[in-house]
Every structure is written in structure tokens, then in C-alpha cells.
């Protein structure tokens, strides 16, 4: 018997992926400021593209830092 695991997205239905939603974006970057891959976060490919775009926009506009010092 094959058992498939039902994956749930870490992004809830009411959450909007936007460069202004900094709390959501911080969940998907490392302490060093790198964007986490989707195999670790469990988001869909479409959500990963939206997250990457929003994180990059937030960095340019100054909502997120490019590098995090230790």
C-alpha cells in the first residue's frame, strides 16, 4: 500500500503575498537573508515565485535588509 501525505501550505488562505507583509516574508528567509527553497518551506511553485518577487521588492524598498549581521 502506498500512503501519500497530504501537504498543507504554510501560507494560509487569508494571507496575501505582498512586499508590505514583512512578517510573512521573514518566515521564508534565513538568518543570513537568503530565500529558503520550496522543498524546505512546502509552498507551491506559484507561491515560491510570488514570495521571491515580494522579498526582492521588499529589499529594494528597504522593508527587508539584504544582509543580516551576526
Swiss-Prot record:
Gene that produces this protein: rps18
A Gene Ontology cellular-component term: chloroplast
GO MF annotation, one: structural constituent of ribosome
Family the UniProt entry places it in: Belongs to the bacterial ribosomal protein bS18 family.
Organism: Ostreococcus tauri
UniProt cross-references to InterPro entries, sorted A to Z: Ribosomal_bS18, Ribosomal_bS18_sf
Compartments in which it is found: Plastid, Chloroplast
Biological process annotations from GO: translation
Protein name: Small ribosomal subunit protein bS18c
Entry keyword Chloroplast: yes
Assembly: Part of the 30S ribosomal subunit.
UniProt keyword list: Chloroplast, Plastid, Ribonucleoprotein, Ribosomal protein, RNA-binding, rRNA-binding
Principal location listed in the UniProt entry: plastid
One Pfam family recorded for the sequence: Ribosomal_S18
Keyword Chloroplast listed: yes
Amino acid at each position: 500500500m502506498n500512503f501519500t501525505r497530504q501537504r498543507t501550505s504554510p501560507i494560509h488562505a487569508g494571507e496575501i503575498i505582498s512586499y508590505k507583509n514583512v512578517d510573512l516574508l521573514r518566515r521564508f528567509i534565513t538568518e543570513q537573508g537568503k530565500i529558503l527553497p520550496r522543498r524546505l518551506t512546502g509552498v507551491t511553485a506559484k507561491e515560491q515565485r510570488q514570495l521571491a518577487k515580494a522579498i526582492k521588492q521588499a529589499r529594494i524598498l528597504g522593508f527587508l535588509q539584504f544582509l543580516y549581521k551576526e
